[in-house]
């Protein structure tokens, strides 16, 4: 039952999919945290895997960078493979001084400079928000693990190299916790197709201070976030 961008067979994906941007990060998650892992798709090297976590069937697949790529894979996973829960796991940049490098942010809502949700919502503003049951499950898991989290709005940017750095001042004033590139599109697709979605990201760098995590720090913080998210997935 291949689609234009996924060559998995019918039933290859679990109902819950962890959705990092980097396909090699998907491979790392599958090989490190899942058991009985099988690679189920590799079109354009956008790797997808299915395995088990503490006995529960879980999938993980790369989404690529940006809303267009993420939206394509999310659409096909939901519509053609019956995926019910998509949880973006990745990294973001912080703006506010009260958000620190290595913090974990849960995107309750996603603002954006993209027009993609206006295109699907008849040129009106769509409130791109996370599914509450997913958000609640991850918050509960974070508390159980003692993981410090921040819950609030993220900003999904179309441009990585922005020509308007003054926009960061506006974001900070409006309480944006982190800048990434996919959540608003993911939330829009999920709402449109009747699925559930959530964005969970670690702060890898601070846009204001220039502070960045080392590769080792990034891996440790990311791993803590993945375990927290996988344990939440057990309750879905």
Swiss-Prot record:
This is Purine nucleoside phosphorylase DeoD-type. A purine D-ribonucleoside binds at residues 5, 180-182, 204-205. The record marks 218 as: Important for catalytic activity. Belongs to the PNP/UDP phosphorylase family. Homohexamer; trimer of homodimers. Its EC number is 2.4.2.1. HAMAP family: Pur_nucleosid_phosp. Keywords: Glycosyltransferase, Transferase. The active site is at residue 205. Phosphate binds at residues 21, 25, 44, 88-91. One of its GO terms (cellular component) is cytosol. Catalyzes the reversible phosphorolytic breakdown of the N-glycosidic bond in the beta-(deoxy)ribonucleoside molecules, with the formation of the corresponding free purine bases and pentose-1-phosphate. InterPro entries: DeoD-type (IPR004402), Nucleoside_phosphorylase_CS (IPR018016), Nucleoside_phosphorylase_d (IPR000845), Nucleoside_phosphorylase_sf (IPR035994).
């Amino acid at each position: 039952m291949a689609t234009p961008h996924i060559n998995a067979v019918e039933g290859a994906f679990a109902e819950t999919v962890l959705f990092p941007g980097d396909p090699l990060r998907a491979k790392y998650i599958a090989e490190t945290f899942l058991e009985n892992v099988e690679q189920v798709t590799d079109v354009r090297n956008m790797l997808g895997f299915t395995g088990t976590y503490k006995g529960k069937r879980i999938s993980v697949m790369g989404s690529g960078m940006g809303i267009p790529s993420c939206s394509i894979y999310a659409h096909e996973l939901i519509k053609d493979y019956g995926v019910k829960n998509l949880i973006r796991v990745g990294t973001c940049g912080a703006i506010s001084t009260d958000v620190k490098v290595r913090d974990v942010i849960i995107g309750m809502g996603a603002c954006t400079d993209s027009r993609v949700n206006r295109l699907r919502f008849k040129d009106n503003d769509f409130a791109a928000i996370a599914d509450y049951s997913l958000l609640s499950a991850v918050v509960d898991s974070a508390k159980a693990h003692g993981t410090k989290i921040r819950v609030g709005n993220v900003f999904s940017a179309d441009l990585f190299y922005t020509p308007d750095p003054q926009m960061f001042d506006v974001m900070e004033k409006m309480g944006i916790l982190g800048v990434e590139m996919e959540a608003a599109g993911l939330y829009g697709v999920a709402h449109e197709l009747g699925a559930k979605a959530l964005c969970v990201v670690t702060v890898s760098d601070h846009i204001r201070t220039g502070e960045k995590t080392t590769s080792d720090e990034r891996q440790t913080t990311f791993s803590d976030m993945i375990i927290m998210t996988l344990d939440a997935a057990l309750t879905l």
